């Protein structure tokens, strides 16, 4: 959604195609490891309310998208180059994917619990590779440490805001 809105409002796709491919592969690595995670186990069959799940998923996606679009808008309005924005969006999307796993995997706030060793290793590896690619300009435009830190702070603030809203809603279901 963030890329679509970026194109509609700014007349360019705010992420390089190379970065899209890398993002997909890196995100799938965590998805494949999620079965090893240490989460809350129920001993009775789950009864999923698909309409409720869709609302929750849309709300989470909307939160990340609104904050991400605000971030991209700020960068565009304050003179960042399209290349820098592209890499910063890539970093933001990778971090949002890693953080959403942490947010939705537990009944606690994401900073109060930790994933399984394998999920944690894959997430840390994904984030480290993302930072290396962004800082070295491999397969995407190079960004500075300052731009990387700005993006990390935005993603972390977004995760905290989203989780502060998400957890009380989930506890009252």
Residue ranges and their predicted role:
Residues 1-112, 133-136:
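Membrane-embedded transport module
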Residues 80, 86-173:
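C-terminal transmembrane module of polytopic membrane proteins
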């Amino acid at each position: 959604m963030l890329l679509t809105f970026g194109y509609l409002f700014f007349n360019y796709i705010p992420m390089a195609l190379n970065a899209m491919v890398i993002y997909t592969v890196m995100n799938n690595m965590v998805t494949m490891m999620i079965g090893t995670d240490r989460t809350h186990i129920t001993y009775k069959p789950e009864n999923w309310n698909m309409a409720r799940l869709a609302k929750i998923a849309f709300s989470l996606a909307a939160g990340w998208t609104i904050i991400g679009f605000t971030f991209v808008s700020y960068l565009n309005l304050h003179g960042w180059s399209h290349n820098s924005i592209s890499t910063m969006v890539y970093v933001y999307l990778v971090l949002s994917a890693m953080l959403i796993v942490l947010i939705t995997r537990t009944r606690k706030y994401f900073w109060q619990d930790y994933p399984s060793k394998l999920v944690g290793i894959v997430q840390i590896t994904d984030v480290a590779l993302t930072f290396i690619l962004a800082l070295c300009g491999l397969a995407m435009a190079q960004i500075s440490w300052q731009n990387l830190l700005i993006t990390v702070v935005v993603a972390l603030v977004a995760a905290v805001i989203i989780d502060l809203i998400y957890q009380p809603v989930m506890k009252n279901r």
